[in-house]
Amino acid sequence: MPMALFRDAVATVPAYAEFLRRNAIDPGRVADPAAIPLMTKQNYHQVFPLSERCRGGRLESADIVALSSGSSGRPTVWPRSAADEEAVFARFEQVFADGFRAAERSTLAVVCFALGNWVGGLYTLGAVRHLAGRGFPLTVAAPGNDLDEILRVVGELGGRYDQVVLLGYPPFVKGVIDAGIARGVDWPAYHPMLALAGEVFSEQWRELVASRAGADPVTDIVSLYGTADAGVLGNETPLSVRIRRFLASRPDVSAELFGDARLPTLVQYDPATRLFEEIEGGTLAFSADGTVPLVRYHIADEGGLFPRERLIERCRREGFEPGDGPDLPFVYVFGRSLFTVSYFGANVYPENITVGLERPDVAEWTTGRFVVRTLEDDDRDLVLNVVVELAPGAEATADRRAVAAESIRRELGRLNSEFAHYVPADRQTPDVELRPADDPEFFPPGVKHRYTRP
């Protein structure tokens, strides 16, 4: 696909031809995909006008646009056509047909992603309606991320179907499950299934949520891996979940396979529509056709690839039989590299937090350095944690923690449109820790500072 897509983009996309010219690439001399320069949001999408990145230089060839938020909070526009979404619909069909058996069970699908032009809600609503149009006995409800409306829909309609599928960001859907339990919802009676996206979650989290919902953790809880740029790129299958659960129980094998103590999301993908590459340094790129073609697009997600048989054979050598599953390769993903953390599906950028710490009532007793990360509390709920470095001699007080937390919350909501729309209001205030200057754990002197941590 890369060479065919490359030649087509050269011939039909004005911005891509200019992109190659600026990189001193003669497209007629390119015979090896490795010679094609990597495309990024910074060197391509933010450089060339939107219409010139579309085929024929025509934005009006798109059927719809979706929005995602960049580091400045200014939305990025992603044009789509119906043809672009066929590859995404195939991934949803694999989840609903193979995992949830929704082709043979009447299903109420409840879209819990934020609605509007935001990419998650648009894609999900379109994909699930497509399945209904294909003959699945499936009805879609789209309350968005309105907790009361979600529970009202489930309560009024859920009992009329064989099963209910909740689609949303993992921490938000867990909040729906927990709120329902508090209000007396008998989740097992609805035979719930969960289709999740936007976060890496632990197998302990999956087990906890499955137990509260009365769901099977292997077949009933599925993670989708996607980006605003190209939609769903891959999805968990019962095979990938079984392997991941085994690796969670064998951290020694996991660390050897993935080169990291963290357990990544593990999904399968179709190389005919989304062809991944592992770039030197342990990040991912992919090629995908669409209204805005992406040729060796470097998304900077940390991760890598495994051929199907290689990963299965390794499991067998360790005494674990993973069983059957799709004949598709695996991609594993840790998430964004050094620059962001994902929280309720929103990319939280250090630049946004910096502004909160630059307000006069905070800047006078902080250095401006911080570390942002997501943690799980004792109830496996996701928490946005910000460790802030105090100015030399400044004291850590409860009042200062509260002031910093509120300042960060206010600026995140103002600057980052994803954060404002995706994160529930009662989860938007971060947990702030105040550490002394040059704290050895978070702010060691003489070391290049990292503003995010996994």
Residue ranges and their predicted role:
Residues 129-133:
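Ligand-binding cleft/hinge of the Venus flytrap
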